[in-house]
Amino acid sequence: ASTPTTKGYAEKADHEGEKMAETYGGGDFQYQFVDGWAKLPEGTTFHECPGVAIDSKDNVYVLTRGEHPIIVLDREGNFVRTFGEGHFSNRTHGLYIAHDDSLLIADDGIHTIQKFSSEGEKLMEIGEKNNPAPKWSGQPFNRPTSAAIMPSNGDVYVSDGYGNSRIHVY
């Protein structure tokens, strides 16, 4: 597995500190580790990254549980922006990018799904912040974990995984 460093880069080492293979996969699906790909500004780090997604313009959105909840990089790893500060708990869980490049972010700490534009404008929130449904009640939400949008009709699907074991559809 990759391990974070203080600058937010990754080092190739397995759980015992041994160097990992340079190429992964086989046939038409071979991948190489890119050391030092992410170029973060001084003081910005990846901290507990529970999600990553790529928009239609090849921007990479990294969901973190750190000071900057969303870190945006271009395809070359150059820093673009951060956003989401003040909107999340330290339990962000899932990141999804819709067909229109909007983002859905699950936060099982405050029991919400939040929708943002790709530029960071908050567009919508589903769920009542810090007010979980009774555990196993089937009512939304008790620690939701992920969300997705059906491209054909715009329906939102939410996995309410930890405290409900349900899929809610809006």
Question: Where is each model-derived feature located?
Answer:
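Eukaryotic scaffold repeat domains enriched in small/polar residues
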Residues: G17-Y170
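N-terminal export leaders
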Residues: A1-T3
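Short, Lys/Arg-enriched N-terminal segments with co-localized hydrophobic residues
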Residues: T5-K19
